[in-house]
Amino acid sequence: MSNIRYISNLTRDTYALILAGGRGSRLYELTDWRAKPALYFGGKYRIIDFPLSNCINSGIRRVGVVTQYKSHSLIRHVTRGWGHFKKELGESVEILPASQQTSGNWYQGTADAVFQNIDIIRQEIPKYVMILSGDHIYRMDYAGLLAAHAESGAEMTVCCLETPIDEAAGAFGVMEVDSEHRVIGFEEKPAEPKSIPSDPTMCLASMGNYVFNTKFLFEQLKKDANNEKSDRDFGKDIIPAIIENHKVFAFPFSSAVAGQPSYWRDVGTLDSFFQANMELLLPTPPLNLYDAKWPIWTYQEQLPPAKFVFDDDDRRGMAVDSIVSGGCIISGAKVKRCVLFDEVRVCSYSFVKDSVLLPDVVVLKNCKIQNAILDRGCIIPEGMVIGYNHDHDRAKGFRVSEKGVTLVTRKMLGLPVGYE
């Protein structure tokens, strides 16, 4: 009981700041009209729901969501789905858009995004500030991270993950640690990451999740703000500047959720986004969205149930090994190994397999589609074939990823585009 009370005190003394202002340029047209944290995932969620759910499930009830790039759909989603917390009970999920709080500039980097909200954080009087990336899919109990931070006497703790060197090169900050997990070296997105001693093919990558003692964080942010040569970034500037003279520790993600398999995905490319969605279709997926003990919360629209119609020999409405969300209608068509978001319609004689269809997609009659991502609101014309010949896909103006996934958006189809 005393340990539970100790953890509870830590989470109550913590303010979480989720950095959700990034574009996600490697997702190309998928983020032309939305920030990466607002991108859909898993049939009914958005990426931002995962760090937010981790906070709530971990007992952290004071959260700020920092927004910047094309944030309309993100702000609307968080306001609708996460606006039920009561400030008078010490609970809140607040939107913190780039509003030039401390200067005439927009957020210049991750550290600047926190610095420009320093007065808002100060009003919460937290003992600890947790800074979280808003654009990854993962499950993590932050209470364990806070406990490790407090017990180690750290001034800053960095969440880390063993990652293949070829995946980390140019993509993640890479750390060196001693036998007690104290950080003794840090490089931001090196071309040639240093390997861990036990495995020359792996390195220790930063997940972009940090815990700071509040006073220490404020001191470092003010110091960085006065440095004209700084890029205002935690990975490039703050961490390298403090590891020599301050207590900075690494927290291994493998110990993030007791009794649960580790799950973390960077869905920052078309291929990784597609693969992470496809993994959910496995009989035992690496991410269990059906775990009642660790629910993923989101905004719930009032939609009718999914419907499958027609059972004729030549047109049978059916879906196999698929996720089919509310409001979908499969009308005399076959869907196989697909993730269908809300209100998707697939019309007679069409066959869609191994694909991700975002909300409000309509596939008209006699279409054949495979290995594709169809963006929200796409209307696929009758008889169109997608994913069977990459040269033909490119000739139609579609984008084909390195691993052969075809992306189709409304603009590529000649349909009107704009904010969601």
From Swiss-Prot:
GO biological process: glycogen biosynthetic process
InterPro entries per record: ADP-Glc_PPase (IPR011831), ADP_Glu_pyroP_CS (IPR005836), GlgC_bac (IPR023049), GlmU/GlgC-like_hexapep (IPR056818), NTP_transferase_dom (IPR005835), Nucleotide-diphossugar_trans (IPR029044), Trimer_LpxA-like_sf (IPR011004)
Keywords carried by this UniProt record: ATP-binding, Carbohydrate metabolism, Glycogen biosynthesis, Glycogen metabolism, Nucleotide-binding, Nucleotidyltransferase, Transferase
GO molecular function term, any single one: glucose-1-phosphate adenylyltransferase activity
The enzyme's E.C. designation: 2.7.7.27
Keyword Nucleotide-binding: yes
Recorded catalytic activity of this chain's protein: alpha-D-glucose 1-phosphate + ATP + H(+) = ADP-alpha-D-glucose + diphosphate
Matching Pfam families: Hexapep_GlmU, NTP_transferase
Residues holding alpha-D-glucose 1-phosphate: Y107, G173, E188, K189, S206
Pathway the protein contributes to: Glycan biosynthesis; glycogen biosynthesis
Signal sequence segment: none
Gene3D superfamilies to which the protein is assigned, alphabetical: Hexapeptide repeat proteins, Spore Coat Polysaccharide Biosynthesis Protein SpsA, Chain A
Superkingdom of the source species: Bacteria
NCBIfam families hit by this protein: glgC, PRK00725.1, PRK00844.1
Subunit composition and interactions: Homotetramer.
Assigned protein family: Belongs to the bacterial/plant glucose-1-phosphate adenylyltransferase family.
Role summary: Involved in the biosynthesis of ADP-glucose, a building block required for the elongation reactions to produce glycogen. Catalyzes the reaction between ATP and alpha-D-glucose 1-phosphate (G1P) to produce pyrophosphate and ADP-Glc.
Protein name: Glucose-1-phosphate adenylyltransferase
Organism: Shewanella frigidimarina (strain NCIMB 400)
Gene that this polypeptide is encoded by: glgC
